[in-house]
């Protein structure tokens, strides 16, 4: 909702609460700011610029005070790290006006604060636990709970339950001047002589404590205690003021739709007042744009053309001087083909400014260039996630600059076919972060040459067979698959797509 992104990967989790009768969503963000948004409409209420880097710590709200922390460079000094208390009643940029207190040089970059009975407990990146006076920020006491602080402290049964990255699990009894250690264990790997890394916090429920580690999931509780899952009690978020009768914001619901050619979709319009409070449903006038053959009735029912091709457009609802838009993607039955002669397909999902259609050798092709942010890997999805039992194919072309060569590939049902430039290999993989399945084969290939890629996934009983094929575009398609992988825990469906790592230009054409 605001500034330039400083980090592309942050982990702050937002919270919801009521401040001054207004329901807010409060969150740390990738631009180093804490934002308060109207929870139902997303309108920004205030922002507080805390760090020059992204925020990973989740904020805590108590009444009209927000507690937040980070471990990077502060915006107003070279000091690293800070814990702050923010007056949550402001509007606009409250950085200079609504800070209640700060605790300097506390590198609390991952672990989120815990508030209990007037004390704010924080764990810094070196696993030092601090108890702060929540009203003033003064340090009441501190103690070491290990060497690497990632997880957050948890309060239960009058005690602090703390995990530390190097396998340490502690139960502490806090007091006014310190904490007494009641128990300390080190979780171990079962088949290796080392500790099991722990990144998650304790979870409390059903008379048990749950903790996850590299070695497994542990449930801690009295032996023989019966387990009975039951709904929890919703927290009291505070009293929200009554809505007025004057709309200031409209929402079209559903806001985004994937439809098949010939489908009908019902839309409704919701109205909210200046405080982001729900007023009610509204009767609206409707228009439809960029959906060939589509029409929408006076009561908001969109009908797509039975013979519609793949496309994307919008429906707009107007009430008085207000309007709101819903996005619609329409997909025809297979087969599909795309040669980019009409530009970038509007129904494709993903990508960014480094993607464009341009002319090469008299043909329109899809170019993916280097990213301005330095994040050169992009995946672009072409259809609904419910698709299965299909084959995806494309012509691809990769450039070279010095020793730098890109990767280029296809996506089918959550499986990626990756033609790797610097490694000169073809890989089939799923879940790139962990490479849940991975098969590869040596495959020398040349830059500045068009190749054809083909990826097919077959669900066979309780497994999936993934087949990939590569050949020079000007040559005949080989009868044998270049690489095959078997997945015993298969992805049953997923969108087709194209993918590439492109510090230099790559091109796609004739995608089908």
Placement of each model-derived feature along the sequence:
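Extracellular carbohydrate-recognition regions
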Residues: 327-352
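Short tryptophan-centered beta-strand motifs in secreted/extracellular beta-sheet-rich domains
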Residues: 340, 392-394, 449-459, 466-470
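Extracytoplasmic beta-rich repeat domains
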Residues: 1-22, 29-30, 47-62, 69-80, ...
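Short, solvent-exposed beta-strand-to-loop segments that form ligand-recognition rims
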Residues: 469-495
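Secretory/extracellular carbohydrate-interaction modules
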Residues: 368-435
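Short S/T/G/P-enriched beta-strand
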Residues: 230-274, 323-333
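Extracellular glycan-recognition surfaces and repeat-rich motifs
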Residues: 344-376
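Short, aromatic/His-centered strand-loop micro-motif at the edge of beta-sheets
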Residues: 432-454
């Amino acid at each position: 909702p605001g500034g330039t992104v400083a980090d592309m990967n942050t982990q702050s989790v937002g919270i919801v609460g009521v401040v001054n009768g207004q329901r807010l969503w409060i969150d740390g963000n990738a631009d180093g700011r804490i934002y308060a948004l109207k929870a139902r409409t997303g309108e920004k209420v205030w922002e507080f610029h805390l760090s020059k880097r992204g925020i990973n710590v989740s904020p805590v709200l108590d009444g009209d005070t927000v507690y937040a922390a980070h471990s990077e460079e502060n915006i107003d000094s070279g000091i690293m790290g800070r814990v702050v208390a923010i007056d949550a009643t402001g509007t606009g940029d409250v950085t200079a006006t609504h800070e209640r207190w700060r605790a300097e040089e506390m590198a609390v970059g991952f672990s989120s604060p815990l508030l209990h009975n007037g004390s704010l407990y924080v764990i810094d990146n070196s696993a030092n636990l601090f108890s702060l006076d929540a009203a003033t920020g003064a340090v009441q006491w501190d103690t070491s709970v290990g060497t690497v602080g990632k997880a957050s402290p948890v309060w239960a049964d009058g005690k602090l339950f703390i995990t530390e990255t190097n396998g340490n699990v502690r139960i502490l009894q806090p007091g006014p001047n310190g904490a007494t250690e009641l128990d300390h264990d080190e979780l171990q790997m079962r088949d290796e002589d080392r500790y099991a890394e722990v990144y998650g916090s304790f979870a409390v429920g059903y008379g048990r404590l749950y903790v996850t580690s590299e070695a497994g999931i542990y449930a801690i509780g009295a032996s023989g205690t019966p387990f009975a899952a039951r709904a929890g009690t919703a927290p009291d978020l505070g009293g929200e003021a009554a809505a007025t009768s004057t709309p200031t914001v409209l929402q079209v619901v559903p806001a985004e739709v994937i439809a098949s050619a010939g489908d009908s979709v019902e839309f409704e319009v919701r109205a909210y007042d200046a405080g982001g409070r729900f007023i009610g449903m509204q009767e609206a006038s409707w228009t439809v744009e960029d959906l060939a053959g589509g029409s929408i009735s006076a009561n908001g029912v969109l009908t797509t053309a039975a013979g519609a091709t793949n496309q994307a457009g919008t429906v707009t609802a107007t009430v008085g001087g207000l309007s709101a838009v819903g996005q619609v993607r329409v997909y025809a039955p297979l087969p599909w083909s795309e040669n980019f002669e009409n530009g970038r397909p509007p129904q494709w999902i993903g990508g960014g400014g480094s993607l464009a259609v341009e002319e090469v050798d008299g043909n329109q092709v899809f170019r993916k260039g280097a990213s301005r942010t330095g994040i050169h890997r992009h995946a672009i999805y072409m259809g609904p996630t419910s698709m299965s039992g299909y084959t995806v194919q494309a012509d691809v072309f990769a450039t070279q600059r010095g020793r730098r060569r890109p990767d280029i590939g296809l996506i089918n049902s959550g499986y990626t076919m990756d033609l790797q430039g610097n490694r000169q290999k073809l890989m089939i993989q799923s879940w790139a972060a962990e490479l849940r399945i991975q098969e590869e084969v040596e495959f020398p290939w040349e830059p500045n040459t068009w190749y054809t890629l083909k990826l097919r996934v077959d669900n066979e009983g309780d497994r999936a067979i993934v087949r990939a094929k590569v050949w020079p575009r000007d040559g005949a398609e080989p009868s044998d698959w270049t690489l095959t992988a078997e997945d015993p825990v298969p992805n049953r469906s997923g969108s087709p797509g194209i993918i590439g790592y492109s510090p230099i230009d790559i091109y796609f054409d004739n995608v089908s």
